[in-house]
């Protein structure tokens, strides 16, 4: 039995059943025993990798598609560029690098990252420092704008 299992048992004994969402949040984000808070989950040292970690092409193509959509919708003066579960920030960095030559795009965007892990927020802050991203704990905190 792991320490986290003991913590979960004690919590259930004290407060009763928990939802699957609460259980998963504890397993993934517990400050001392959570998957995303205690180890690097990505790449060679982690358990999995994603397309943006292998090649910048996906992020760059996505960025150009987003910029074209922004232009096609009249280039709104403000819009939110959000990513849910941004990992190390690699995808967003690729998107932003590919779009830096699109006049007005970066000036109009607000970069918001939906991330619950403090450790990953620190990694994302380093990767995206020039763009001053802000963070939200869940998608319900995203701004009401395009």
Predicted regions and their residues:
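Rossmann-like AdoMet
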Residues: 1-84, 88-144
């Amino acid at each position: 039995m792991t320490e986290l299992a003991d913590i979960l048992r004690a919590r259930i004994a004290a407060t009763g059943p928990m939802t699957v969402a609460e259980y998963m949040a504890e397993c993934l984000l517990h400050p001392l025993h959570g998957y995303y808070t205690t180890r690097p989950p990505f790449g060679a040292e982690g358990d999995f990798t994603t397309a943006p970690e292998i090649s910048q092409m996906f992020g760059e193509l996505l960025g150009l598609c987003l910029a074209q959509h922004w232009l096609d919708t009249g280039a709104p003066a403000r819009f939110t560029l959000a990513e849910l579960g941004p990992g190390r920030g690699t995808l967003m960095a690729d998107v932003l690098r590919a779009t830096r030559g699109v006049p007005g795009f970066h000036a109009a965007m607000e970069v918001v990252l939906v991330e619950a892990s403090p450790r990953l927020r620190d990694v994302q802050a380093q990767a995206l420092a020039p763009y001053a991203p802000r963070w939200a704990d869940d998608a319900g905190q995203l701004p009401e704008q395009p």
